[in-house]
């Protein structure tokens, strides 16, 4: 109701062969599912994770443990020793600590940043276009030597190369806007933390072309200076505080979740205009020497709506993972050419994914067909009215009936993954529809005297049946029972007190049964009731 949260799940992860395109959606709203997935294809192990669960560092640590345990089980007969990767005495609490809250300082003064609109790559792919993944490798040693020759880090060198690769696709008019990259920063390197939850910030190096100094060396020098000025502890703390201050705001904290989601989406849309592309360096992945002999490389890439370059290295192999949903791959081509000009030998890996498994949109197709049928029924009824009986407007009732059916089916489709939430929404919609039909047919009061109380009782019975059939735990059904019971008590009670209801029996029965359901939850499921109320409202 007010915020997103993570909760423990009894679901067991199942390892299976890769069956869908890389970086497919893991989080489906209202669907109870894990936020990570482990698959394999030939000699490759895949670990995909939803970003709300962890960041690149946390995902890397999990993958290291996963690979280590797999190799140990596969080769222990050959004498492979079992080793510990995690630090000694590292507890679950250490790994689940919220480091953002730990290092948040409300007294730290905020630094105002001038927001600049960045150049945007315009060549978008088609709707539902598959994610384009291009993976390349090169020698860490060779690239590191070149970076040292310039007096910069590998990240700075690749950032400058990426900016220049994008610039090559820009026109003179487009040079009015700078090329700006978002570069995530692992805050654990600045603020000590063993948390495996998200703990990262970001910086936004860029370059304004068109000033006469547009060579690679000019861009590299500007990026180098930006990194030096913006990777300080003070600067990153200020950036971190800006974000956490919004979460900690006493008024915004209690804003409805739906309102927050809309504001966040609007803010994200505006923030997109400040960034051209993303470069993420996951740094070095280390494995024990005994295990390293069985590993060829580590690679990383992320789902994105723009162009993103992810980097990680293992031993002397640097893996570059480009992901994009744009039609053009010219930027990637330019980037590889720049690296070759710097003396790096770039090897483009052959795609080794299974046959494309496109998303299944059959459910959406059914809703589209039903929508067309509803519109067709309304149009046909209007034509019939005009041709056969101009003075009678049966089409109005047909339109109202179609709208009623379409609304209930559309909500049912959207909320299909959570039947109890579906029922809660249907309770609200059907109550409103009853009143509208009563008003539209000449108010007789049947909607409030009989309709609403009966709907309230029916929905509560349906919820009980769903919970029984699906063997739902109290944690899964509690909030929906409470919402339905409270709604079914308060609304009929208000209608009774205000004198709107003239036939009292259905409303009295509805209020009494709803009250008993609520009391039963409090008495017999007290612990679960308090836990859910605290989780949803931070009370109790």
Residue ranges and their predicted role:
Residues 1-14, 82-134, 138:
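Short amphipathic alpha-helices and their capping loops
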Residues 529-540:
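Short, highly charged, low-complexity non-transmembrane loops/tails of multi-pass membrane proteins
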Residues 455-466, 476-497:
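Hydrophobic alpha-helical membrane segments
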């Amino acid at each position: 109701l007010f915020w997103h949260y993570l909760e423990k799940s009894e679901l067991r992860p199942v390892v299976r062969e890769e069956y869908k395109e890389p970086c497919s959606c893991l989080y489906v709203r209202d669907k109870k599912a894990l936020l990570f997935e482990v698959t394999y294809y030939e000699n490759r192990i895949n670990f995909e994770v939803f970003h709300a669960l962890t960041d690149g560092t946390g995902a890397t640590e999990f993958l290291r443990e996963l690979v280590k345990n797999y190799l140990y089980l596969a080769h222990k007969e050959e004498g492979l020793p079992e080793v510990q990767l995690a630090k000694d005495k590292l507890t679950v609490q250490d790994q689940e600590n919220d480091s953002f809250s730990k290092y948040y300082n409300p007294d730290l003064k905020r630094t105002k940043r001038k927001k600049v609109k960045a150049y945007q790559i315009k060549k978008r792919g088609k709707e539902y276009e598959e994610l384009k993944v291009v993976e390349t490798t090169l020698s860490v040693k060779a690239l590191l030597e070149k970076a040292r020759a310039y007096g910069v880090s590998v990240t700075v060198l690749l950032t400058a190369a990426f900016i220049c690769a994008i610039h090559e696709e820009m026109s003179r008019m487009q040079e009015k806007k700078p090329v700006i990259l978002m570069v995530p920063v692992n805050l654990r390197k600045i603020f000590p933390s063993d948390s495996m939850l998200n703990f990262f910030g970001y910086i936004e190096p860029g370059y304004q072309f068109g000033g006469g100094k547009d060579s690679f060396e000019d861009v590299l020098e500007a990026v180098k200076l930006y990194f030096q000025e913006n990777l300080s502890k003070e600067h990153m703390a200020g950036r971190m505080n800006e974000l956490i201050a919004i979460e900690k705001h006493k008024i915004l904290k209690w804003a409805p979740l739906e309102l927050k989601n809309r504001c966040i989406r609007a803010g994200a849309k505006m923030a997109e205009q400040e960034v051209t592309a993303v470069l993420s360096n996951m740094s070095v992945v280390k494995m024990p020497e005994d295990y390293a002999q069985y590993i060829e490389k580590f690679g990383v890439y992320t789902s994105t709506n723009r162009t993103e370059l992810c980097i990680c290295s293992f031993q002397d192999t640097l893996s570059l993972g480009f992901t994009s949903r744009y039609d053009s791959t010219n930027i990637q081509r330019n980037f590889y050419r720049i690296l070759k000009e710097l003396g790096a030998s770039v090897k483009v890996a052959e795609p080794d994914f299974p046959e494309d498994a496109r998303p299944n949109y059959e459910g959406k197709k059914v809703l589209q067909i039903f929508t067309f049928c509803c519109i067709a029924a309304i149009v046909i009824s209007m034509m019939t009215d005009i041709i056969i009986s101009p003075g009678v407007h049966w089409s109005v009732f047909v339109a109202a009936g179609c709208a009623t059916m379409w609304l209930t089916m559309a909500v049912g489709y959207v909320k299909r993954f959570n039947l109890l939430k579906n029922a809660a929404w249907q309770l609200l919609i059907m109550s409103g529809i009853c009143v509208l039909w009563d008003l539209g047919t000449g108010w007789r009061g049947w909607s409030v005297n009989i309709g609403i109380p009966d709907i309230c009782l029916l929905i509560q019975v349906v919820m009980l049946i769903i919970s029984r059939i699906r063997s739902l735990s109290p944690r899964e059904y509690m909030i929906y029972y409470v919402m339905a019971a409270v709604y079914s008590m308060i609304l009929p009670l208000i209608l009774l007190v205000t004198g709107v209801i003239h036939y009292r029996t259905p409303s009295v029965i509805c209020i009494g049964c709803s009250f008993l359901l609520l009391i039963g939850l409090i008495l017999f499921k007290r612990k679960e009731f308090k836990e859910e109320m605290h989780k949803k409202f931070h009370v109790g």
